[in-house]
């Protein structure tokens, strides 16, 4: 809302009349129901991704889907093992499809590969919460995890799969 009413009018290169009459201005409100639209007329026209007001909007439907899955897992009363099962499903989908897919599979303006790949990290992080791994979140373990993770970079497939566990641990350990 602030992007449309404050940022857009201040930064647009088109006239105010053109800005407010534009279909793109009204269309930007579709972001409120997670139908992602990046553009406002005449705003950021010279960026590498021209006209994109907020290029991180792609993550909103992905995040919403992850939180919705957490609610569903909680609703069926299988939080600990349900979260682990979700993490394993997302890992299997990542290994079996998302890394090998050559074409985007877009639903509701969201690339399903991104949903799967982000789902791995989200649910591994959720597992760390469920299984109380946070007792290991300190600088010593974080630095050790970074060193082990980087040592695995010699073997790309192992490194990628290890990233699913190491990156959430490292981020959460440094963040606490």
What are these regions (language model features)?
Residues 56-62, 110-123, 160-161:
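Membrane-interface micro-motifs in multi-pass membrane enzymes
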Residues 122, 147-176:
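Alpha-helical transmembrane segments of multi-pass integral membrane proteins
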Residues 69, 73, 120-132, 167-175:
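Transmembrane alpha-helical segments
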Residues 89-101, 144-156:
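Aromatic-anchored segments of alpha-helical transmembrane domains
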Residues 64-92, 129-141:
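Solvent-exposed interhelical
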Residues 6-15, 77-78, 100-101, 132-133:
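Short helix-capping/hinge motifs at transmembrane helix termini and TM-loop junctions
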Residues 2-62, 167-171:
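Membrane-interface helix-loop-helix regions
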Residues 49-53, 101-112, 133-134, 151-160:
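Membrane-interface helix caps and helix-loop-helix hairpins in membrane proteins
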